[in-house]
Amino acid sequence: MATFPHFGTAAIHVGQEPEQWDMNQVVPPISLSSTYKQDNPGEPKGHDYSRAGNPTRDVLQKNLAALEDAKHCQVFSSGLAATSAIINLLKYGDHIVCSDDVYGGTQRYIRRVAVPNHGLEVDSVDLTDVQNLEKAIKPNTKMVWFESPSNPLLKVVDIAAVVQTAKKANPEIVVVVDNTFMSPYFQRPISLGADVVVHSITKYINGHSDVVMGAVITDNDEFQQHLFFMQLAVGAVPSPFDCFLVNRGLKTLHIRMRAHYENALAVAKYLEANDRIESVLYPALPSHPQHEVHEKQTKGMSGMISFYLKGELQESRAFLSALKVFTLAESLGGYESLAELPSIMTHASVPAETRIVLGITDNLIRISVGIEDLDDLVADLDQALKIAIPKV
């Protein structure tokens, strides 16, 4: 498996230098202080107040920026807090082109907060074809927002092609890529020309399902200044303890992602060969419609798989209820395997007519394949499928 050079070494060492601490701690300490003594009025030693900055947060931000091969990282109290900070860069009347298949929470924020409350315009299009982007761009377009792969349909967008198309129309258009499904271990959108990368740290980066956090990563100095000010003004900061947990989780990110990929590829192949399954959506499979694009711009794939059962809502409910190793729950990216029904769970806020057009139907199952023993995962899926669909 070809990976970015020195990733594991960077994850373990960048920003973690013992010499930055008074006692040369090998593991960065948790700085819980909300305020800091100043030697003279208006002359703080490093930080003045923890909403503006915190040593434990600094360590995490340096590490994440390095892993995306970028200059700046700002971490927020959630992925949607990070999303709102990015979109707040825009002004009244500005236009966003958004991919039609994104996380339901992102859609909800843009359509029910940013558009009615802040006067933004949005068009949702299928960005797997850049001609759709060309047609959607307007004189007031200021941002293009997408995920690759997307949630939950695992559509792959050619990041470099989108960047080229957007910048040709207007060099000032900001291209934002949500890299949550891939992590920087498998994909680095900034190296492909994206201006901004956003992560729900809650997922693969933390990897232990015990933190809610988001990150915005960029090479753009002006954009970073905006992010810092927005966080200072709004106060969407993560706790030092959560920053410590994520920083610890990063030390095994490269190991975890390899295990997720190995398990998920085997599970996807099993599902594709199963008579109870209509189709499987996993970009690492040659059958995936954007498989070649995925291979071109990534170093592998995470544990995210979506698939269509041969059935309807009744069969989906029966399948999910019969699982024993997979847990019926929202979220993804932890060491444990999860399964969910997007139409009534993660994407329930998407209008029903939109879900139908996109293909988020009641027989679409999304699974986050964890790092348990592969044989146990396959056996669990097999027994649940046989219960849900007894005859084929």
From Swiss-Prot:
Record's GO cellular component terms = cytoplasm; endoplasmic reticulum
The catalytic activity of this protein is classed by the Enzyme Commission as 4.4.1.1
Task: Alphabetically list the UniProt keywords.
Answer: Amino-acid biosynthesis, Cysteine biosynthesis, Cytoplasm, Lyase, Pyridoxal phosphate
Pathway listed = Amino-acid biosynthesis; L-cysteine biosynthesis; L-cysteine from L-homocysteine and L-serine: step 2/2
Question: A single GO molecular function, which one?
Answer: cystathionine gamma-lyase activity
Catalysis performed (reactions): L,L-cystathionine + H2O = 2-oxobutanoate + L-cysteine + NH4(+)
List where in the cell it is found. Cytoplasm
Where is there biased composition of kind Basic and acidic residues? Answer: 40-50
- Its GO biological process terms? cysteine biosynthetic process via cystathionine; transsulfuration
Any Pfam family hit: Cys_Met_Meta_PP
Q: Where is this region: Disordered?
A: 32-55
Q: Which domain of life is it from?
A: Eukaryota
The cross-references to InterPro entries, in alphabetical order and at most eight, read: Cys/Met-Metab_PyrdxlP-dep_enz, Cys_met_metab_PP, PyrdxlP-dep_Trfase, PyrdxlP-dep_Trfase_major, PyrdxlP-dep_Trfase_small
Sites bearing N6-(pyridoxal phosphate)lysine, chain numbering:
K203
Task: Please list the residues that bind substrate.
Answer: R51, Y103, R108, E330
Q: Which Gene3D superfamilies match?
A: Aspartate Aminotransferase, domain 1, Type I PLP-dependent aspartate aminotransferase-like (Major domain)
Q: Which cofactor does it need?
A: pyridoxal 5'-phosphate
What family does this chain come from, according to its entry? Belongs to the trans-sulfuration enzymes family.
Name under which the protein is recorded = Putative cystathionine gamma-lyase 2
Tell me which species this is from. Caenorhabditis elegans
Gene name of the encoded protein? cth-2
